[in-house]
């Protein structure tokens, strides 16, 4: 539950969430501070109220270097990849009826054959976080900073504007008939 909430409310990659420790977390100021594994970018991310509530309820130990998600951390360190955690997320989605089980089907033949890519993965939470921020009216610059996107082009690929936001956008248009 915690890694899913963290992905949803921060847009962090699973590799970054897996390596979070208590010293990354400032609950008094509701800020998560880390260095992105992929970009080495230093990030300060405000913690959403629901995610803060989750962290507040976690039993904190005496070691600030202790991982927030010990089993995910151990798997990430042992495997040097977040693949097993991503696969576990997929199984949760299948069990919840939100995704179909992987079939390992390919498209094409011979050297041109490509594995079918799942449309639902942990990375989708990064898209969802970006879209939620944009649909809530957060500026592009602020959304990009929270998610960690360096360019508008990348941010656009992660943004999916919902119909409610589009309807709200056209409400102020004048009636010219």
Short names for language-model regions:
Residues 1-14, 18-19, 28, 38-42, ...:
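Basic, Lys/Arg- and aromatic-enriched nucleic-acid-binding interface segment
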Residues 37-57, 65-93, 107-109, 121:
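C-terminal catalytic core of Y-nucleophile DNA break-rejoin enzymes
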Residues 27-29, 49:
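Residue-level signal for tight coil/turn positions that link beta-strands
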Residues 36-40, 147-172:
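Catalytic-site neighborhood detector that most strongly recognizes the C-terminal catalytic loop/helix
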Residues 2-16, 124-150, 157:
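C-terminal catalytic core of tyrosine-transesterase DNA break-rejoin enzymes
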Residues 33:
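Minor-groove-contacting beta-hairpin "wing" of winged helix-turn-helix DNA-binding domains
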Residues 6, 81, 114, 118, ...:
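Residue-level marker of regulatory loop/turn positions in helix-turn-helix DNA-binding domains and
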Residues 97-119:
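Short helix/loop segment immediately N-terminal to the Walker
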